[in-house]
Amino acid sequence: ILPTATQYSRNAIFSGLLPVDIEKKFPKQWKNDNDEGGKNLHEEEFFREQLKRIGKGDLKVSFTKVLNHQAGQELVNNIHNLLQNDINVIVYNFVDMLSHACTEMEVLKELANDEKSYRSITVSWFEHSPLYQALRKIADKKINIVMATDHGSIRVQKSAKVIGDKETTTNIRYKHGRNLNFEQKDVLSFRDPADAGLPMPNVNSSYIFAREDVYLCYPNNYNYYANYYRNTFQHGGVSLEEMIIPVVRMTSK
């Protein structure tokens, strides 16, 4: 799904709907990029509604979001209590937070300056994380675990110039707005958002998605932002690394 960004892809997973259909079905809950407030606050509601839609609304469900280490420890302590449910959804936010931190923190940018080192940091975190502890505690139980993610990321290398109005969004791998000017070779573009299953935030809104390892910068302070974001891990655009995601099903031995 495009954009390969959490507010679109994770909401789509839990709702079972394209973003344009989420907006139609849940107009009060859906928020576009420039709207104020959290963009992923209604995932549990979306998921429960999806279960009802497919005839599974009577299942006993829990929905847990782990946004920090303390919440992770609470998950470890409570993991056995979750086994009484039919479905337990656990959203673990660390890897997405890591990709953003590697852009904003110079130390992490140095430590994760290529794909190999980025994966190494992620593996090291996982091996010492509450998530791994929780999985080990239930490894002998007769349950199915499905692990997946909502999008990947790519190390960006090539800056490209985009011109838009003040309402144009800020993400450097995709943008939507009116009167966007860009080089067609750099992006996949949709003049009609509905063609990509996306809502239309404003009249005449269009979407563009950076191809391969391109990232999009505005003319203002272009050189500064081109240097700032070069060699960082980003998501939202069109690449195999962002769009093809792992889905793993695990059972106890």
Stretches found by the model and what they are:
Residues 1-253:
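Feature captures the catalytic ectodomains and active-site-proximal regions of enzymes
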